Amino acid sequence: MQFCPTCGNHLIVAVDEEGRNAFDCRTCPYHFPISTFLYSRHEFAQKEVDDVLGGEEAFESNQQTEVTCENTKCDNNRAYFFQLQIRSADEPMSTFYRCTKCKFQWREN
């Protein structure tokens, strides 16, 4: 994917008057003939879920609420929680909980 150095828009590959491939900008007159084979590959490292959500310490900085722990071996009624919109915007937010006592985690949609 190439971008126009003049206006910054995405360049398309088009065939010029001589039948050669060229990068053309749809919004300005920028035209760049392609004279060599162009290829580049970028591999991105996928982040771990803990990196995105903040890791182990993320829950401790959140609010607490009264909710019964879903771990059957725990009788605690307090949990840290946060909400995320992980589905489409017309769906309700998902609430993630972590027990303050046993550290058990669960979610409600």
UniProtKB/Swiss-Prot annotation:
Subcellular localization: Nucleus, Nucleolus
Binding residue positions for Zn(2+) 2: 69, 74, 99, 102
Domain of life per record: Eukaryota
GO CC annotation terms, alphabetical: cytosol; nucleolus; nucleus; RNA polymerase III complex
Complexes and interactors: Component of the RNA polymerase III (Pol III) complex consisting of 17 subunits.
Function: DNA-dependent RNA polymerase catalyzes the transcription of DNA into RNA using the four ribonucleoside triphosphates as substrates. Component of RNA polymerase III which synthesizes small RNAs, such as 5S rRNA and tRNAs.
PANTHER family in the cross-refs: DNA-DIRECTED RNA POLYMERASE (PTHR11239), DNA-DIRECTED RNA POLYMERASE III SUBUNIT RPC10 (PTHR11239:SF12)
Name assigned to this protein: DNA-directed RNA polymerase III subunit RPC10
Provenance organism: Schizosaccharomyces pombe (strain 972 / ATCC 24843) (Fission yeast)
